[in-house]
Amino acid sequence: MKPTETLQEKGKLFLVVMMPILITQIGLYAMNFFDTVMSGQAGANDLAGVAIGSSLWVPVFTGLNGVLLALTPIIAQSIGAEKRDDVPYVFLQGLYLSIAISIAVILIGAVVLDPILSAMSLEDEVGRIAKEYLIGLAFGIVPLFIYTTIRCLIDSLGETRVTMFITLLSLPINIFFNYVLIFGKLGFPRLGGVGAGYASAITYWFILAVAIVVVVKVRPFTDFQLFKKLYHVSLKKWKEILLLGLPIGFTIFFETSIFAAVTLLMSTFDTATIAAHQAAVNFASFLYMIPLSIAFTLTIAVGYEVGAKRVEDARQYSRLGITFALIMGLVAGVIIYVLRAPVASLYTNDSQVAWLIQQFLIYSIFFQLSDALATPIQGVLRGHKDVNVPFVMALVSFWIIGLPTGYLLANFSPLGPYGYWIGLITGLASCAIALSWRLKQMQRKFERAARLSQNGNS
């Protein structure tokens, strides 16, 4: 980041920072996208099984990934304070924490997976595929979380294009192993949807290997000599990471887990409905990478201006990012409506499932618009280091308002499964309204603080 004078300069810099982030996010999500699409081509049971497995895994990963994202500002502040010697220490503590988290996830998953699946009203084949898909995926959990730590280091140095390169390099690897393992090509067994789990695990090991080579062999990362000294575990540093990361992680978890909860509650419906719901959520979430990338960029830009106490510049970046997100949300809504039939055909050859996908996609237009407002505002608030109140707002909006509304409509009205989607829309809209109020409050607080600082210096 650098100081800018005009709105045009801000717009150009915003896009320069955002585009590598957007490509990276789309690439990462594309792996889940191709898991779903290619599993759907193997059969409705495979699509439903992967849907259930993903619904259990994605909230866990995104929430814990959010915790580790706290490393980015911690490392960035060390560099900004010219404490470059602290970077290897902070990085290794994050690395140790990521390994501890991944081992805990595997152990807890081994204990609770069977009871969770048994408690769901799943067809036997769907339950088997979901379980074996997650077992396959588990082989890649450790490298995935270690890579997250390395990515935080890379991004904190502003080298977002490196992350983009690694992601784009890994995508064809994921597609290749999906193809050979799901459909049994090149002498591999035909695993169906289960193969998508093993393909993801292989890809995660590949990503980690490339990332390690980059930070060990390529400047500016080599300047830090990250692995020259292996420090002991510091619970004090872990506490610092967790105090900042847990509110971020829980906020992300509450938003992503609401979709997972709806998918799990939909297990009372038939396999076609489960499969169609997951396909629609998958495509809508793919488009969600746009406001998410805008949010990440806003955190960087607004945080930079807040640190420099430039009130109007921070406000301009906020308006710029939120307006851009709303425009892209409208564009995404039009794309979903116009292309809902071709999109449905990407996921399945089953006419009943394809018809249901199209119906769900129409509902997804409305929560796409809510996300276009709520998500960038979250990015702005993180730029202000405001994480605790948005966490509470997310909890109330999604779990106290959204999910109960969806459950009541789905089970006590003629809407059936569509009731859950109305609940999702209600929760997201509530969160967007609450966050808008919080943003105005934080901007007024920042203006007062900056004014007092100027008066004190004059």
Curated annotation (Swiss-Prot):
Pfam families: MatE
UniProt keywords, alphabetically: Antiport, Cell membrane, Ion transport, Membrane, Transmembrane, Transmembrane helix, Transport
Molecular function per GO: antiporter activity; xenobiotic transmembrane transporter activity
Known role: Multidrug efflux pump.
Coiled-coil segments on the chain, per record: none
PANTHER family linked to this entry: FMN_FAD EXPORTER YEEO-RELATED, MULTIDRUG RESISTANCE PROTEIN NORM-RELATED
The name this protein goes by in its record: Probable multidrug resistance protein NorM
Cellular compartment(s): Cell membrane
Lineage start: Bacteria, Bacillati, Bacillota, Bacilli, Bacillales
A GO CC term attached to the entry: plasma membrane
Top-rank taxon: Bacteria
Protein encoded by which gene: norM
Similarity comment: family membership: Belongs to the multi antimicrobial extrusion (MATE) (TC 2.A.66.1) family.
Keyword Oxidoreductase carried by entry: no
Annotated NCBIfam families: matE
Record's bilayer topology term: Multi-pass membrane protein
Organism: Halalkalibacterium halodurans (strain ATCC BAA-125 / DSM 18197 / FERM 7344 / JCM 9153 / C-125)
